[in-house]
């Protein structure tokens, strides 16, 4: 059996109980007449179970099926093996066309116009009144006699068929025409499907090699596994959907019953049309004949055409497209991005051999396609001269380096929004940064897969005589499977999900819920499973070349690492750490042995976690023995410093270097000046003594001599010294006086002398015009202010006031010439310290240092980044 009406089950569920055991009701499609469907049986039981009544057509169908084997024997004896194979191949093609085209056309017209049902009603085929006696018939009683005889014959034959098939209690005339038409339709379906199946099996049997060596190998073992799996799929599908969906019942009438998903319908979309044909490929493996494989591919492909043009349109008309608000979330986000950003256009995406969303006004699209064209043409024109070893290294390195680059961007973007910040601080928008990422990611995919295609193609071309045709076709099938997976993934998560939009535009997400529609209903991470099967297909196509195996392993590992260690943690952070069980997972866990293994693993995991937690508690128990105030070192440090000062005063009572109010304030927030009091014995004082400001981390190595430059952060102790260094040093000396025993003074370091960098600093008193240290002050902290960022106006006001005090603002624009210590980097640090964002120097120069533009831009960036948090 090769078909089943499956999409009904996938859209709204599947009946899981026999109609004979529950009270199932049905109604006609157009007239809404309700009725209870009769009990029916599957195809094999109807035709071959001797305990069931058989109609004339069923007997003829059974004889036709059995006769195929006698015909095969007779033709084989008379005309030989090759003729017999082609004879049954032609038969199979005929019945396959009768199935997909014949049944397809019948169902198409039945779906759109209820053609079969209306024909039965028009000609009173299931009515008690004969056609030529029906006063209400739409046909005139003067119709020609042949037509009357024909329809009377059809009427009698159809009624006889149903009576001979159904139990005695079945009242033919009590049921609407829809159910009776469906029962007759089933007979022709039985004939076509069984003939399709039997002729294919005979053709395959005639193609099996005679040598036992050719049969007993790994291919045959894999083929048997696929066949057994195919049988389970068919049996489980019929268990779930029953005859109603198996025979396309909803084209005739609609059942009203409780529907649920179950079994094989949790594993794959359209299982009877997808994994339900794996037996074809299992038989092709056993035969090891590429002709059988091509026939199987034709049969499978025609079934997909039937699904696309017959079943899916009917399902969408009858039940809707099956999408809900959650499944459309990413698509709505794409629309919202386009709506709010008029210069945004959908990104170029490579799907298989085609490109979507090409924009003729976007240079990067030409660059991407041009790269593909150049690589392909170069490979074709220079195929004879290309060294495959060098090409392999090129593919490997390109894939690895580009993956590291992509993964780094995603990781840093997840951790700190690094990529978005990079563009925001340079004056670009959040969406613009996302557009650049879209180009980078798509170009990465296009470049790596183009190189893989070129390398695989040259491998096949250079070693074509050793290539197995069956392996080549199977490899192409795997490539097609990966292409289908990519398309289904993009269909389910839209462009926003395909380009990791929740890494870059999480503020556009309104519902924190992962999609479970489409391919994500069956697999949690389809790109990690099916997203690399095409690469493994190249391994088959190249007859298991070692280099292709290495590339396939690289593709698989990089894919796995990206999903496991970057994508999954980010998804948990954005959507919550909710465990989503895929359809495949549900089905596997439904198997008792696997469920027991899962329970054992969970118990072991719980035991390990509990033991680790207990050990952590024990290792931290010693901390409770420490004094309660042990971690508070501030008061202790103050006491130590006072004791050291007391000792220094006793040794040299007139040596002193203290910051004003240092007991009260040890943290000076810019632009607050720092005033320093100094005292020096008269015999040690030199008019050229000077005081420098240093970072503690730079001077801690030597307490007797300063070995780093002050960088201009210094002041004289006397207004009369260092006359050639300008007024700045004179203005910093605010007081100086001398007595018989000592000289004392006061020096103020304002914004013209201070550092504009957060850190721990100290003052050093130097003897004369040298770097010999006489006194060192208590370390203190200098920090940039935190400006008010409540509103952009308040932020601008505070920023303007600060820049004015620092003397770097003129006509509302930043001018660093006013203070050599407050440059562009200091302004960037001030903004970052206040609002948490960083603007690039290039951007601030581009806006001419306009304080209004800079403050509002920084505030906008903060709002954007806050929305991404």
UniProtKB/Swiss-Prot annotation:
One Pfam family cited in the UniProt record for this chain: PEMT
EC annotation from Swiss-Prot or TrEMBL: 2.1.1.17
GO molecular function, one term: phosphatidylethanolamine N-methyltransferase activity
Compartments where located: Endoplasmic reticulum membrane
Residue ranges, Lumenal side: 2-55, 108-187, 234-244, 288-362, 411-439, 485-534
N-acetylserine sites (modified residues): 2
Function, in words: Catalyzes the first step of the methylation pathway of phosphatidylcholine biosynthesis, the SAM-dependent methylation of phosphatidylethanolamine (PE) to phosphatidylmonomethylethanolamine (PMME).
Family affiliation: Belongs to the class VI-like SAM-binding methyltransferase superfamily. CHO2 family.
HAMAP family in the record: PEMT
Record-given protein name: Phosphatidylethanolamine N-methyltransferase
Organism: Saccharomyces cerevisiae (strain RM11-1a) (Baker's yeast)
Organism lineage string: Eukaryota, Fungi, Dikarya, Ascomycota, Saccharomycotina
Gene: CHO2
């Amino acid at each position: 059996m090769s078909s089943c009406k499956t999409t009904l089950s996938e859209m709204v569920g599947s009946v899981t109980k026999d109609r004979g055991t529950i009270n199932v009701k049905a109604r006609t499609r157009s007239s809404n007449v309700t009725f209870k469907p009769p009990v029916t049986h599957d195809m094999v039981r109807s035709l071959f179970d001797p305990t069931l009544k058989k109609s004339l057509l069923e007997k003829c169908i059974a004889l036709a099926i059995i006769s195929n084997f006698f015909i095969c024997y007779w033709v084989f004896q008379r005309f030989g093996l090759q003729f017999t194979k082609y004879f049954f191949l032609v038969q199979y093609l005929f019945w396959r066309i009768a199935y997909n085209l014949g049944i397809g056309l019948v169902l198409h017209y039945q779906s759109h116009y209820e053609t079969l049902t209306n024909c039965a009603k028009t000609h009173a085929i299931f009515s008690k009144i004969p056609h030529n006696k029906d006063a209400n018939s739409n046909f005139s009683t003067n119709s020609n006699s042949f037509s009357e005889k024909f329809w009377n014959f059809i009427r009698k034959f159809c009624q006889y068929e149903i009576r001979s098939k159904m139990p005695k209690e079945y009242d033919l005339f009590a049921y609407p025409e829809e159910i009776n038409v469906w029962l007759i339709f089933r007979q022709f379906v039985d004939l076509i499907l069984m003939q399709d199946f039997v002729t294919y099996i005979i053709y395959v049997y005639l193609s099996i090699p005679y040598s036992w060596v050719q049969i007993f190998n790994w291919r045959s073992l894999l083929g048997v596994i696929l066949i057994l799996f195919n049988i389970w799929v068919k049996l489980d599908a019929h268990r779930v959907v029953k005859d109603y969906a198996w025979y396309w019942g909803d084209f005739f009438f609609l059942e009203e019953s409780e529907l649920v998903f179950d079994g094989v319908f949790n594993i794959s979309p359209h299982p009877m049309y997808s994994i339900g044909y794996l037996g074809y490929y299992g038989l092709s493996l056993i035969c090891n004949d590429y002709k059988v494989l091509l026939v199987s591919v034709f049969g499978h492909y025609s079934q997909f055409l039937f699904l696309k043009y017959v079943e899916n349109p009917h399902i969408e008309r009858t039940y809707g497209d099956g999408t809900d608000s959650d499944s459309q979330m990413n698509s709505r986000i794409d629309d919202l991005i386009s709506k709010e950003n008029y210069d945004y256009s959908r990104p170029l995406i490579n799907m298989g051999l085609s490109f979507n969303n090409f924009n003729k006004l976007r240079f990067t699209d030409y660059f991407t396609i041009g790269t593909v064209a150049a690589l392909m043409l170069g490979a074709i024109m220079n195929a004879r001269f290309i060294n495959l070893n060098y090409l392999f290294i090129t593919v490997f390195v390109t894939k690895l380096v580009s993956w590291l680059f992509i993964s780094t961007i995603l990781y840093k973007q997840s951790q700190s929004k690094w990529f978005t910040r990079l563009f925001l601080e340079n004056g670009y928008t959040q969406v613009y940064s996302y557009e650049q990422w879209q180009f980078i990611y798509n170009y990465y995919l296009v470049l790596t897969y183009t190189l893989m295609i070129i390398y695989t193609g040259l491998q096949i071309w250079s070693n074509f005589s050793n290539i197995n045709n069956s392996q080549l076709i199977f490899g192409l099938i795997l490539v097609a499977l990966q292409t289908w997976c990519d398309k289904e993934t993009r269909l389910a998560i839209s462009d926003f999900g395909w380009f990791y939009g929740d890494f870059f535009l999480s503020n556009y997400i309104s519902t924190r819920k992962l999609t479970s529609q489409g391919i994500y209903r069956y697999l949690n991470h389809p790109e990690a499973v099916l997203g690399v099967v095409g690469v493994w297909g190249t391994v088959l196509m190249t007859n298991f070349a070692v280099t292709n195996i290495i590339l396939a392993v690289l593709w698989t590992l990089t894919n796995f690492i990206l999903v496991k260690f970057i994508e999954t943690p980010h998804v948990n952070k954005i959507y919550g750490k909710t465990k989503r069980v895929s359809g495949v997972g549900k089905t596997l866990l439904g198997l008792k042995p696997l469920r027991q293994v899962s329970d054992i693993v969970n118990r072991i995991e719980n035991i390990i976690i509990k033991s680790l937690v207990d050990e952590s508690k024990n290792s931290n128990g010693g901390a409770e023995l420490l004094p309660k105030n042990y971690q508070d070192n501030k008061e202790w440090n103050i006491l130590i410093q006072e004791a050291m000062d007391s000792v220094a005063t006793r040794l040299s009572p007139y040596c002193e270097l203290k910051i004003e109010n240092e007991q009260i304030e040890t943290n000076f927030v810019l632009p607050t000046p720092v005033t320093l009091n100094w005292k020096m014995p008269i015999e040690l004082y030199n008019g050229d003594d000077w005081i420098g400001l240093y970072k503690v981390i730079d001077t801690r190595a030597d307490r007797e001599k300063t070995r780093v430059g002050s960088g201009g952060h210094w002041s004289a102790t006397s207004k009369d010294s260092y006359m050639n260094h300008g007024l700045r040093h004179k203005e910093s000396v605010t007081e100086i006086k001398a007595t018989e025993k000592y000289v004392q003074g006061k020096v103020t370091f304002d914004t013209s002398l201070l550092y504009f960098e957060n850190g721990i600093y100290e003052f050093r008193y130097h003897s004369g015009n040298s770097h010999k240290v006489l006194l060192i002050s208590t370390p203190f902290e200098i920090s940039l202010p935190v400006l008010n960022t409540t509103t952009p106006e308040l932020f601008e006001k505070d920023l303007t006031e600060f820049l004015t005090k620092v003397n770097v603002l003129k006509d509302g624009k930043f001018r660093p010439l006013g203070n050599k210590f407050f440059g562009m980097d200091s302004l960037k640090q001030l903004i970052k310290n206040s609002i948490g964002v960083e603007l690039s120097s290039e951007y601030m120069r581009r806006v001419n240092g306009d304080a209004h533009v800079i403050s509002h831009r920084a505030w906008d960036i903060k709002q954007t980044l806050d929305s991404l948090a």
